[in-house]
Amino acid sequence: MRLSWILTILSICLSALAAATGAEGKRKLQIGVKKRVDHCPIKSRKGDVLHMHYTGKLEDGTEFDSSLPQNQPFVFSLGTGQVIKGWDQGLLGMCEGEKRKLVIPSELGYGERGAPPKIPGGATLVFEVELLKIERRSEL
């Protein structure tokens, strides 16, 4: 009887551990503000054209891309699928001149396929970004 009770408790503990591990397996986007600005007349929103400087690294610190060496900002329309989901979500509500650090799980980056040869499948991405300019598109 006592052995049966111990096995039941052990089974419950293992089930709880498996459930907790599964919940942690799906990571969330992390957004850290590295530099705030005092004056922010407009914040980025879906449909805006953003001019960004960025440096992208893997979790181990290996740099895979950057706009800085060419001093050529990356320009794209926010929230329209032109960039990875982690950017479309992580750059909302930014001010011109603001800097952020984004830690993007693979589900919001390049997923299990990666972007060979520089980004392996399942990679978490770390971006340091700076919003240089917002072009607000007129609403239709």
Swiss-Prot record:
Pfam families on file: FKBP_C
InterPro entries found in the cross-reference section: FKBP2/11, PPIase_dom_sf, PPIase_FKBP_dom
- What is the activity regulation entry? Inhibited by both FK506 and rapamycin.
For this UniProt entry, what is the primary localization, expressed as one broad class?
endoplasmic reticulum
Q: Which reaction does it catalyse?
A: [protein]-peptidylproline (omega=180) = [protein]-peptidylproline (omega=0)
Q: Which GO terms describe its molecular function?
A: peptidyl-prolyl cis-trans isomerase activity
- This protein's source sits in the domain of life called Eukaryota
Q: Where is the PPIase FKBP-type domain?
A: 47-135
Q: What is any one GO biological process for this UniProt entry?
A: chaperone-mediated protein folding
**Keyword annotations of the record:** Endoplasmic reticulum, Isomerase, Membrane, Rotamase, Signal
User: Can the keyword NADP be found in this entry's annotation?
Assistant: no
Entry GO terms, CC: endoplasmic reticulum membrane
> Topology with regard to the membrane?
Peripheral membrane protein
Return the EC number. 5.2.1.8
Question: Partners and quaternary state?
Answer: Interacts with ARFGEF1/BIG1 and the C-terminal of EPB41L2.
> What task does this protein carry out?
PPIases accelerate the folding of proteins. It catalyzes the cis-trans isomerization of proline imidic peptide bonds in oligopeptides.
Q: PANTHER family in the record, alphabetically?
A: PEPTIDYL-PROLYL CIS-TRANS ISOMERASE FKBP2, PEPTIDYLPROLYL ISOMERASE
**Could you identify this protein by its name?**
Peptidyl-prolyl cis-trans isomerase FKBP2
Instruction: State the organism's lineage.
Output: Eukaryota, Metazoa, Chordata, Craniata, Vertebrata
